[in-house]
From Swiss-Prot, chain A:
It comes from Caenorhabditis briggsae. InterPro entries: ExoRNase_PH_dom1, ExoRNase_PH_dom2, ExoRNase_PH_dom2_sf, PNPase/RNase_PH_dom_sf, Ribosomal_Su5_D2-typ_SF, RNase_PH, RNase_PH_CS. Coiled coil: none annotated. The gene is exos-4.1. Its main location: cytoplasm. Belongs to the RNase PH family. GO terms for molecular function: RNA binding. Gene3D superfamilies: GHMP Kinase, N-terminal domain. The keyword Cytoplasm applies. This is Putative exosome complex component RRP41.
């Protein structure tokens, strides 16, 4: 089955430039400083943020805050049962990318010698897992009230026969499809995370990049609305 | 989450409990509000989410696997269910990396013991044995998303919910070449001219009336309690994980497992008292679950998170 | 061991220089360091040098059972060793985050980009496959570690040849290289990595930064491209804030570099193949080390044309005695030269006379005689020791003093015309000792 049918529809009925429905809920986790549950269609991600708190001696940085990320998937999140929820190479790599991305966004100079923990749990993975984690983390950080340069938004884009497709599902994430996960701040042209899977021809690079950037801007609009609504809902508590 | 309370608070708590009054107004045998929702995940064969008192949050997911085994190599029939409890780092920073592995393994082992006679207890579980050398393997995985005491209780409720939600496909077993068997999904033809793949597969459900339940009974001072909050867990003398199963023949409860969690000393009479309390509480819980499972409407999967 | 951090003044100087477009090794901001690539004498080994960064890669293959998930695909395993030899901050036997990143990148480039045909590595589906192992050892670190490691690994894979196999009904026959020529791996394309450093929020681009420069930069990005103008990997090494245009620019720079380096790799492999097919013994890694070593000298081997001895009696029974020195023969090996017992005294007397006659032509100047006699003593000591070890009689042991410009013409102590009786008897004693 081809990814884009002859009429121009994808397997789940979307158009190539259409993203899935985004559903969010903030403040689920009572123990954490900030938490967010985010859905990109069938991909469900839970993110919890702890901190900033005094860091352990091994991780302490004198001039800025240390960011520790952990990406884990539940054993029942994928199509086949996975034995190890975390600790394998792929999860460590994604954790590292999340750390690097958010080090650029969070104003770490405001909290020297402290640590911020970001934990992402993928409850159900149906493609674009990394992008969903970045979005969930941005909202969780906003919920925790940690100062940032802006809300980061991410999207995964692939290309099929010179046509870009955005927000891939797991059925579309095949071994042959080149895809780029891009994260930007506030939908502007400031890229904080870039990850490429499979080989991409250089002529297609600018096409994919532009599509990804546009999608990030769209996702940012959704996330910004969510953050504003949450703030309005909390305003009575703040005594405003 | 590590809760630190002062000695005066502990004293207040212990003396209150000994008079059957807890800090949040419950009695010693009361549970916190339980929210149970099934069918939460569409990617699993059965799932359930349980919230205890709005803080402890456990998600259970079941995945089926077709397993081939060597009947000669196994002396007794192996249990088709395997349990795995994972503490997500969302629950607490201390569970990051390998922090939650030890506690998770302890609870998984307790469940394995509690369900060890499940082939006798659960009436139609033996249907999972398909043919000589093939059976369904039921992998029950639990993910603890939030932690505020009483994790084993929440886990056992989630397991019962998920098992009742589980749908196992019906299969037809036919002999094949080379001594093997071919296993094909059964699709009952209801007439009409639908293609073979479009006919939905027939499913059967497990009967969970007498499913074992794992309860945590703790001893604070001279009183026995169920469902401790984190503050109460700081004051306990000792804790027992007791597995209770409903006996269908006699209107009574069987104890399938007793495990001590943590340290502490217990007298023989205390253990008897605690098991009695566990049976009584289990009775109440079974009734509540039955009522809930009957009256629950099927909602959109995953809706519970958005509430 | 902790590496002392970069001092603030060093950092400021480097940043200032970079901002004005100058670098400490006189390169331009967009200039690469020279790359040296050498393949070893053993098949499947390569050393890559970029500036001061040195990496060695070795490829080996083994037959193994495939995983049940992929029964007809071969397996490629990558192992990286970051030893304290490269950088003192590395821990021995433990891969820190840098090592994990390197392994991840190598896996991405070699495994995930599918540059090697793993299906051709299958011998028997479900039972036997080739497990190819790439070992990468970092010898020295000075920036662009990922580039160097990838290049070394790719060259080693290109160079490697696995043994040829045939399938028999009940077993697999593996041929050695002498029976059937080994088969090279089926490589579709060669991904080449480039490390691009970023400065000033991505406004400036610094190509191929050294270790010191990398510590001052804002961040870096690694791009892997191949000759077919495909981007194989876009790896974010550190945190960065870039625009998409800048990313595209970096990719273009990496692309041109990849094309140049692919040509270099192919050249090196072709040259090595030419040498091997001409049956020339490959130089291997010896050409990487400069041959200027002051602490050892070479001495030319000299062959002594020893005279033949006439036998007086019983010629049929005795072997032809040839007290020749066999050059390159290990005099310490037991039983290398077997000789029979001959009448010693007459033999010795004859030999003496002959040697005296031939030695007469050599002029031994007086000032050297003292030195010569010292050496003579040393030689005697050495001869004593060697004789003691030697089993066979009449074997002459060649001892040369290294460093001497004029090796002694004869092994035996220099015999002057007026030979002492002592000397002869002592010499005889030596012989008798055996």
């Amino acid at each position: 089955m081809s990814i884009i049918s002859e009429h121009g529809f994808r397997m789940d009925g979307r158009r190539p430039a259409q993203i899935r429905n985004i559903n969010t809920r903030l403040g689920l986790n009572r123990n954490a400083e900030g938490s967010c549950y985010l859905e990109h269609g069938n991909t469900k991600v839970l993110c919890a943020v702890y901190g900033p708190y005094e860091s352990k001696a091994s991780k302490r940085l004198e001039d800025r805050c240390a960011i520790v990320c952990q990406y884990s998937t539940t054993t029942f999140s994928g199509l086949e049962r996975k034995n190890r929820p975390r600790g394998d190479r792929k999860s460590t790599e994604i954790s590292r990318l999340l750390e690097k991305a958010f080090e650029s966004v969070i104003l770490t100079e405001s909290f020297p010698r402290s640590q911020i923990d970001i934990f992402c749990e993928v409850i159900q993975g149906d493609g674009s897992n990394l992008a969903a984690c970045v979005n969930a983390t941005s909202l969780a950080l906003a919920d925790a009230g940690i100062p940032m340069k802006g809300i980061a938004s991410a999207a995964t884009c692939g290309i099929v026969e010179t046509k870009p497709i955005v927000d891939l599902t797991s059925r579309e994430e095949t071994d042959l499809l080149p895809r780029v996960t891009l994260a930007t701040i506030c939908g502007r042209d400031e890229v904080i995370l870039v990850e490429l899977q499979n080989r991409l021809h250089i002529d297609h690079l600018s096409v994919v990049m532009d599509a990804a950037k546009a999608t990030c801007a769209d996702v940012y609009e959704c996330l910004a609305v969510v953050a504003q609504q949450h703030l309005k809902a909390c305003a009575p508590i703040l005594g405003n | 989450m590590e809760v630190h309370i002062s000695d005066d608070e502990k004293l207040f708590l212990i003396s209150g409990v000994e008079q059957d009054i807890r800090n949040d107004g419950r009695t010693c045998a009361d549970f916190r509000t339980i929210v149970l929702e099934r069918g939460v995940l569409s990617g699993t064969n059965g799932s359930c989410r349980v919230q205890l008192g709005q803080t402890t949050d456990v998600l259970a997911g079941i995945k089926l696997e077709l397993e081939s085994f060597d009947p000669a190599a196994e002396k007794e029939a192996k249990q088709p269910m395997s349990f795995h409890v994972d503490f997500s780092a969302n629950a607490s920073s201390q569970f990051a990396g390998k922090g939650g592995d030890q506690y998770g393994e302890e609870i998984s082992a307790a469940f394995q013991v509690a369900f060890s006679r499940s082939l006798d207890i659960l009436p139609n579980l033996s249907k999972t044995l398909l043919a000589e050398g093939y059976r369904w393997k039921i992998n029950v995985d639990l993910s603890v998303l939030q932690w505020a005491g009483s994790v084993p209780d929440a886990c056992s409720l989630a397991i019962i919910g998920a098992l009742s939600d589980l749908e196992v496909p019906e299969v037809e077993v036919a002999p094949d070449d080379g001594g093997k068997v071919s296993i094909v999904l059964k699709r009952p033809r209801t007439g009409g001219n639908m293609r073979d793949e479009e006919v939905p597969v027939a499913m059967w459900k497990l009967d969970v009336q007498s499913c074992p339940m794992l309860l945590t009974v703790s001893k604070i001072g001279s009183a026995n309690l169920v469902d401790c909050s984190p503050e109460e867990e700081c004051c306990i003398r000792s804790q027992l994980l007791i597995g209770v199963a409903k006996n269908l023949n006699v209107d009574d409860y069987d104890i399938t497992c007793i495990k001590q969690h943590g340290g502490g000393l217990l007298e023989m009479e205390s253990i008897q008292d605690m098991t009695e309390l566990a049976s009584k509480t289990a009775g109440g819980l079974y009734q509540a679950i039955e009522k809930r499972l009957k009256t629950e409407e099927k909602r959109k999967p995953g809706h519970s998170f958005l509430l | 061991m902790r590496v002392p951090p970069l001092t603030t003044c060093e950092k400021e100087v480097i940043l200032e220089a970079l901002k004005s477009g100058k670098r400490f090794d006189f390169r331009g901001l967009e200039e690469f360091r020279g790359v040296k690539l050498v393949v070893g004498s053993e098949i499947g080994t390569a050393i890559c040098t970029i500036g001061n960064t040195k990496v060695i890669a070795a490829v080996s293959a083994q037959i193994a059972e495939p995983s049940s998930m992929r029964p007809h695909k071969g397996v490629i395993i990558i192992d990286v060793d970051l030893s304290p030899m490269a950088n003192v901050s590395n821990e021995h036997d433990r891969l820190g985050s840098k090592g994990m990143e390197l392994i991840r990148l190598l896996e991405l480039i070699i495994r995930d980009s599918r540059c090697i045909d793993v299906e051709s590595l299958c011998i028997r589906a479900g039972k036997e496959i080739w497990k190819v192992r790439v070992d990468v050892r970092i010898l020295d670190e000075d920036g662009s570690l990922l580039d160097c490691a990838c290049l070394a690994a790719i060259t080693a894979l290109q160079h490697f040849k696995r043994p040829n196999v045939t399938l028999e009904p009940h077993h697999t026959l593996i041929y050695s290289e002498y029976e059937k020529a080994p088969v090279p791996l089926n490589i579709y394309h060669m991904p080449i990595c480039t490390t691009i450093g970023l400065l000033d929020k991505g406004q400036m681009v610094v190509i191929d930064p050294t270790e010191k420069e990398a510590a001052c930069l804002d961040g870096s990005i690694v791009v892997a491209c191949n000759k077919r103008r495909e981007v194989c990997a876009l790896h974010q090494s550190t945190n960065l804030v870039l625009s998409t245009k800048q990313i595209e620019r970096c990719v273009k720079l990496a692309m041109s570099r990849a094309e140049a380096l692919t040509a270099v790799v192919s050249d090196v492999i072709k040259q090595d193949q030419r040498e091997r097919s001409a049956f020339k013994r490959p130089d291997g890694f010896s050409i990487t080390t400069p041959s200027l070593i002051l602490t050892s000298g070479t001495a030319a081997a000299r062959q002594i044309n020893a005279p033949r001895i006439q036998h007086g009696r019983e010629p049929e029974e005795k072997m032809l005695y040839q007290p020749s020195v066999i050059v390159n023969e290990n005099p310490l090996s037991v039983g290398s030269v077997k000789q029979e017992e001959v009448d010693e005294d007459a033999l010795i007397a004859e030999q003496l006379s002959i040697i005296q006659n031939s030695v007469g032509g050599v002029a031994v100047s007086d000032p050297q005689s003292s030195g010569v006699s010292k050496r003579k003593k040393e030689k005697e000591m050495v001869d004593d020791l060697l004789d003691g070890i030697c089993d066979s009689e009449e074997e002459e042991v060649k001892t040369e003093i290294l460093g001497s410009s004029e090796p002694m013409e004869v092994v035996l102590p220099v015999v002057e015309q007026q030979k002492d009786e002592e000397d002869v008897t002592s010499w005889r004693k030596k012989k008798k000792k055996v």
